[in-house]
């Protein structure tokens, strides 16, 4: 049978970021689409994973008002200051970043159909940095055929 002759491909790419401010939102959809094209995968899955515990990858609409609302909502849930409100901040000042990451999650998974990311209307992939000003990376792992 033809099914047994198919070979699953695996492709890995790292996307590096240095967000100059403490918090920042980056639309990485284009970079993920480029990685998918490089992989040659036509049918499968893409995992996009923040490789730091103070950053997130998620899917949403690329609309500036929504971005401001998200920032305000996260700041209400886990305000950056006063630093002394967090037990983690004995030697660091980023407990809020860890909590925001816990709420927003680590990764996004997107189906690949016909060599393209299979999104719903308006969906885009974002990297959200909660404790920036240093280099961090995102893992893009693509599997399929």
Task: Describe the residue ranges of each PLM region.
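Short amphipathic
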Residues: 9-19
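Mid-chain, well-packed structural core segment of small domains
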Residues: 71-120
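Solvent-exposed alpha-helices and their adjacent loops that cap or buttress functional pockets
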Residues: 9, 40, 101-103, 117-119, ...
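Short, small-residue-biased leader/transition segments that mark boundaries at the very start
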Residues: 1-4
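A generic structural signal for well-ordered coil/turn residues at beta-strand boundaries
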Residues: 11, 53, 104-106, 113, ...
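Structural motif
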Residues: 45-47, 56, 109, 124, ...
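Active-site beta-strand/loop microenvironment that shapes enzyme catalytic pockets
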Residues: 24-70
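C-terminal binding/interaction regions
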Residues: 120-129, 133-145
């Amino acid at each position: 049978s033809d099914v047994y002759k198919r070979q699953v491909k695996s492709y890995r790419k790292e996307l590096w970021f240095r967000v100059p401010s403490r918090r920042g939102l980056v639309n990485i959809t284009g970079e993920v689409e480029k990685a998918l094209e490089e992989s040659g995968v036509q049918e499968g899955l893409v995992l996009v994973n923040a490789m730091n515990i103070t950053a997130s990858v998620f899917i949403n609409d690329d609309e500036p008002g929504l971005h401001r609302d998200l920032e305000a909502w996260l700041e209400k849930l886990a305000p950056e200051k006063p630093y002394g409100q967090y037990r983690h901040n004995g030697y660091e000042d980023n407990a809020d970043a860890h909590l925001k990451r816990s709420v927003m999650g680590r990764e996004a998974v997107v189906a690949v159909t016909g060599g393209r990311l299979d999104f719903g209307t308006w969906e885009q992939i974002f990297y959200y940095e909660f404790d920036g000003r240093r280099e961090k990376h995102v893992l893009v792992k693509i599997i399929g055929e």
